[in-house]
Amino acid sequence: MAREFSRTRRVGQQIQREIALILQREVKDPRIGMVTVSDVEVSRDLNYAKVYVTFLQLENDAERIKEGLKALTEAAGYIRSLLGSAMRLRVVPELRFFYDQTLVEGMRLSNLVTNTIREDKRRMAESGREEDDAAPDETTEDNA
């Protein structure tokens, strides 16, 4: 019977919290800037951890993201050593950093939906139809 939260998931959540604190308090590299640890996936044998991060910035600058990931990769050994002293694990996972695209993709999809709704309203206004006319009333009364 599978448990609701496996050990690897619990370890991943703890690693996420610890790395967030380490990045906030210990790592002083200006290339990293404001970074958020959005998720950590740990391998079943706890030897590797994929750390998904997002960078707080005004626009999505691919060069700054690449530079931030490079800085995190260079600091991975230091972060791993601090992680080892903060957590009681027999093996501290090797850290691999990845940029988390979900926030950017979510914003892109939200903008697409907003633009589609705006375009539909504009087309209805041009054709002289009201919003209420676009969807006929589907409610019927039952005489039962």
Curated annotation (Swiss-Prot):
Its main location: cytoplasm. Residues 129-144 have a biased composition (Acidic residues). Residues 120-144 are annotated as: Disordered. Pfam families: RBFA. Monomer. Binds 30S ribosomal subunits, but not 50S ribosomal subunits or 70S ribosomes. Belongs to the RbfA family. One of several proteins that assist in the late maturation steps of the functional core of the 30S ribosomal subunit. Associates with free 30S ribosomal subunits (but not with 30S subunits that are part of 70S ribosomes or polysomes). Required for efficient processing of 16S rRNA. May interact with the 5'-terminal helix region of 16S rRNA. This is Ribosome-binding factor A. It comes from Aeromonas hydrophila subsp. hydrophila (strain ATCC 7966 / DSM 30187 / BCRC 13018 / CCUG 14551 / JCM 1027 / KCTC 2358 / NCIMB 9240 / NCTC 8049). The lineage of its organism: Bacteria, Pseudomonadati, Pseudomonadota, Gammaproteobacteria, Aeromonadales.
